[in-house]
Amino acid sequence: MKKTIIAATTAFAVSACSTGFYGTSGQDSHIAGYALANNGTTLVTMGSIASPAKMDTFTLSNKLDAVAYRPVTGELLGYSNGAVYSVDAKSGKLTDLGATFTNGAMISKDASATAMDFNNAIDAVRMVGSDGTNLVYFPVGFGDQDKRANSVLKFTSTFYVKGDSNEGMTPEIFANAYTNAIAGAKASSTFQFALDSKTDSLVSLANNAGELKTVAKITIDGKAVDLSSMGGFDIVSAEEGSDAAYAILQLEGESKAGFYSIDLTTGAATLMADLPMGGFSGFAVSGGK
């Protein structure tokens, strides 16, 4: 069943920058957003992130833990512990892709969140659990007869590197996003950011190595915040080197979430719109062309 939710939005207009955000001028009006709600049983779609509080919702046939947009093909994929799905963003229909999970390639059922995003340099998707589990799904057709195609492999669990300001802290990654998410093609390089609800920080994540380095604390209006693990984070790129970061954030103690732009240098979150609901898990945006 499809439902439409419309709420008042915050009007805004900001200028573009390579490490921050585009803003909601005409260049953003064609970018769609996708999220999960109601414990992963509902797909939420934003026809345009220029009006993020105008949403359509679709009841899913299976619970999903996360969603990710595949820049090379324009597909939306979903992950549930033990399965990878293609997701029809216009209906919410799920198709199990029959992925093989290697030994240990599972995120704990007790994990509060799962992050998921495509590495556009290799066209494979990384899933990171708040429990530290670090997985990669290599899609159908990956590489040239690559034996990893349509399988999920486990890599080094996430940890803060020696000398980091959060060294010794147990991370709770709930969202991740790669730069250079250009539409329709692989990127020459990418860099992975993530959000940690335990340290309330924007961090870098060194792919298979699992190494975390703190970039900055997340702030709103210059003040530190207490992030919950409900929400998501993604980057859209008009071209290589031009990255716009967006996030759905819900603060601890709040019942509803907000839609924010994220400065990838300072960690500053700028409110773009108050959303009419909370409890989101996962977030993805479509390509930027």
Residue ranges and their predicted role:
Residues 40-46, 83-88, 132-139, 198-207, ...:
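Structural motif
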Residues 28, 36-39, 79, 128-130, ...:
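Short, solvent-exposed loop/turn segments at conserved positions within beta-propeller repeat blades
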Residues 32-36, 74-78, 85, 123-127, ...:
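Conserved beta-propeller blade signature
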Residues 23-49:
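An edge-strand/N-cap motif at the start of beta-rich repeat modules
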Residues 19-28, 66-74, 105-123, 168-188, ...:
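Structural signature of eukaryotic scaffold interfaces centered on beta-propeller domains
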Residues 51-59, 93-106, 146-166, 211-225, ...:
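A short beta-strand motif characteristic of beta-propeller blades
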Residues 268-289:
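Blade-level signature of beta-propeller repeat domains, shared across WD40, Kelch, NHL, RCC1
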Residues 1-20:
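Gram-negative bacterial Sec-dependent N-terminal signal peptides
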